[in-house]
Amino acid sequence: MEDGARLILRSSAALREKEKVLVLVDRDTKPMGDAFLAAARSLGTDPVMICILPREHDAEEPPELVATAMESADLILLATRKSLTHTHARRQANRAGARVISMPGITA
Protein backbone atom coordinates (compact mmCIF):
# COMPACT_ATOMS: atom_id res chain seq x y z
CA MET A 1 0.00 0.00 0.00
CA GLU A 2 2.81 2.38 0.84
CA ASP A 3 4.30 2.12 -2.67
CA GLY A 4 0.96 3.07 -4.21
CA ALA A 5 0.58 5.95 -1.77
CA ARG A 6 4.08 7.18 -2.62
CA LEU A 7 3.23 7.10 -6.34
CA ILE A 8 0.12 9.23 -5.73
CA LEU A 9 2.11 11.69 -3.63
CA ARG A 10 4.82 12.04 -6.26
CA SER A 11 2.78 12.06 -9.46
CA SER A 12 -0.70 13.32 -8.60
CA ALA A 13 0.17 15.62 -5.69
CA ALA A 14 3.66 16.73 -6.79
CA LEU A 15 4.66 16.59 -3.13
CA ARG A 16 7.77 18.57 -2.25
CA GLU A 17 10.06 18.15 0.73
CA LYS A 18 9.08 20.06 3.88
CA GLU A 19 5.51 20.70 2.73
CA LYS A 20 2.82 20.57 5.43
CA VAL A 21 0.80 17.42 4.75
CA LEU A 22 -2.51 16.59 6.43
CA VAL A 23 -3.92 13.08 6.08
CA LEU A 24 -7.59 13.00 7.09
CA VAL A 25 -9.14 9.59 7.77
CA ASP A 26 -11.97 7.98 9.70
CA ARG A 27 -11.83 4.69 11.57
CA ASP A 28 -12.79 2.74 8.44
CA THR A 29 -9.97 4.19 6.32
CA LYS A 30 -7.19 4.47 8.90
CA PRO A 31 -5.08 1.67 7.33
CA MET A 32 -4.90 3.67 4.09
CA GLY A 33 -4.05 6.78 6.10
CA ASP A 34 -1.17 4.91 7.72
CA ALA A 35 0.20 4.10 4.25
CA PHE A 36 -0.03 7.74 3.14
CA LEU A 37 1.56 8.89 6.39
CA ALA A 38 4.54 6.55 5.91
CA ALA A 39 4.87 7.47 2.23
CA ALA A 40 4.82 11.20 3.00
CA ARG A 41 7.49 10.72 5.68
CA SER A 42 9.67 8.82 3.23
CA LEU A 43 9.44 11.79 0.84
CA GLY A 44 10.83 14.28 3.35
CA THR A 45 7.78 15.70 5.06
CA ASP A 46 6.52 15.59 8.65
CA PRO A 47 2.88 14.70 7.98
CA VAL A 48 -0.01 14.88 10.43
CA MET A 49 -2.89 12.41 10.45
CA ILE A 50 -6.27 13.23 11.97
CA CYS A 51 -8.88 10.52 12.49
CA ILE A 52 -12.47 11.78 12.65
CA LEU A 53 -15.72 9.99 13.34
CA PRO A 54 -17.22 8.69 10.10
CA ARG A 55 -19.55 11.22 8.52
CA GLU A 56 -23.21 10.28 8.13
CA HIS A 57 -23.37 11.42 4.50
CA ASP A 58 -21.29 12.95 1.71
CA ALA A 59 -20.57 16.68 2.07
CA GLU A 60 -21.04 16.67 5.85
CA GLU A 61 -18.61 19.17 7.32
CA PRO A 62 -15.65 17.91 9.37
CA PRO A 63 -15.23 19.19 12.94
CA GLU A 64 -14.23 22.87 13.19
CA LEU A 65 -10.79 21.99 14.57
CA VAL A 66 -10.13 19.86 11.49
CA ALA A 67 -11.31 22.63 9.16
CA THR A 68 -8.82 24.98 10.82
CA ALA A 69 -6.00 22.47 10.35
CA MET A 70 -6.96 22.06 6.69
CA GLU A 71 -6.48 25.79 6.09
CA SER A 72 -2.84 25.63 7.22
CA ALA A 73 -1.82 22.60 5.13
CA ASP A 74 -0.02 22.61 1.78
CA LEU A 75 -1.44 19.21 0.81
CA ILE A 76 -4.54 17.50 2.18
CA LEU A 77 -5.33 13.85 1.56
CA LEU A 78 -9.01 13.20 2.22
CA ALA A 79 -9.09 9.43 2.70
CA THR A 80 -12.51 9.07 4.32
CA ARG A 81 -15.47 6.78 3.76
CA LYS A 82 -17.80 9.66 2.82
CA SER A 83 -16.79 12.47 0.48
CA LEU A 84 -15.63 15.78 1.94
CA THR A 85 -15.11 17.28 -1.51
CA HIS A 86 -18.19 19.51 -1.45
CA THR A 87 -17.64 21.00 2.00
CA HIS A 88 -16.99 24.55 3.08
CA ALA A 89 -13.85 23.30 4.88
CA ARG A 90 -12.36 21.96 1.63
CA ARG A 91 -13.22 25.12 -0.29
CA GLN A 92 -11.64 27.30 2.41
CA ALA A 93 -8.50 25.14 2.39
CA ASN A 94 -8.21 25.57 -1.39
CA ARG A 95 -8.67 29.32 -1.06
CA ALA A 96 -5.86 29.32 1.52
CA GLY A 97 -3.61 27.62 -1.06
CA ALA A 98 -3.89 23.93 -0.15
CA ARG A 99 -3.88 21.22 -2.78
CA VAL A 100 -6.47 18.54 -2.05
CA ILE A 101 -6.71 14.93 -3.14
CA SER A 102 -10.10 13.48 -2.26
CA MET A 103 -10.46 9.70 -2.15
CA PRO A 104 -13.89 8.89 -0.68
CA GLY A 105 -14.44 5.23 0.00
CA ILE A 106 -10.78 4.30 -0.51
CA THR A 107 -9.95 0.72 0.45
CA ALA A 108 -6.79 -1.31 0.72
For each feature predicted by the language model, list its residue ranges:
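Active-site bordering "gate/hinge" segments
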Residues: M1-A108
